[in-house]
């Protein structure tokens, strides 16, 4: 299932009900410098954001469910394990899964994500969406440059970029109902080529 994704079906082959359990699995393009024994051995890749926990939890659930697979089948129930790749990249591995048809016949999906705000042994539940979906936008500002000693002779795009970064979220917060759940976060910003 894609380059690293995996789908595992347990229980009934023609179920009356199919439940999917989803966990993200891929490493992130982050250099790990913790020095811990379990640190990534691959330079520039590590299991941050809980992905190692998510993959381990889903694998553990799969092992436990495999032990009762016959009982699930007798009850006409199936469980589909979705080891989802590329959660953090756009457009993301979920879209590949959906396009491949892995959601066909699935009645309910439970996803897992660790949350450091919860105490060990606690779980948090919510019906419906829990976190934001992401879209990626690229904004390019073009104009006449110049020297910092004469900003009045330039379009001063660095200043304009600062206004875009601060004003777009502010304007949207006044134009969109806050219950709609819209958030704008700029992940990377760059401006200019010279210090002056």
Segments (PLM) and residue ranges:
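Active-site-proximal helix-loop elements at catalytic-domain edges
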Residues: 13-18, 115
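DPxDG-like acidic metal-binding loop motif
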Residues: 55-62
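Generic beta-sheet signal
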Residues: 18-19, 79
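Histidine/acidic-residue-rich, glycine-tolerant segments that coordinate divalent metal ions
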Residues: 5-7, 28-30, 35-46, 52-53, ...
């Amino acid at each position: 299932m894609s380059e690293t994704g995996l789908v595992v079906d347990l229980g009934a082959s023609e179920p009356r009900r199919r439940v999917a359990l989803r966990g993200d699995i891929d490493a992130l393009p982050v250099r790990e410098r913790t020095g811990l024994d379990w640190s990534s051995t691959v330079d520039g890749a590590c299991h941050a954001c809980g992905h190692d926990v998510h993959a381990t939890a889903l694998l553990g659930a799969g092992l436990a469910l495999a032990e009762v697979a016959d009982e699930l089948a007798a009850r006409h129930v199936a469980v589909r394990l979705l080891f989802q790749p590329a959660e953090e990249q756009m457009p993301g591995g979920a879209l590949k899964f959906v396009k491949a048809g892995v959601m066909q016949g699935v009645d309910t999906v439970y996803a897992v994500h660790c949350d450091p705000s919860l105490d060990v042994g606690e779980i948090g539940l919510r019906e419906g969406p829990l976190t934001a979906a992401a879209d990626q936008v690229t904004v390019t500002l073009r104009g006449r440059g110049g020297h910092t000693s004469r900003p009045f002779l330039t379009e001063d795009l660095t200043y304009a970029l600062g206004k875009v970064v601060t004003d777009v979220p502010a304007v949207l917060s006044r134009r969109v109902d806050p219950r709609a759940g819209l958030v704008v976060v700029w992940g990377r910003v760059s401006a200019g080529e010279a210090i002056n």
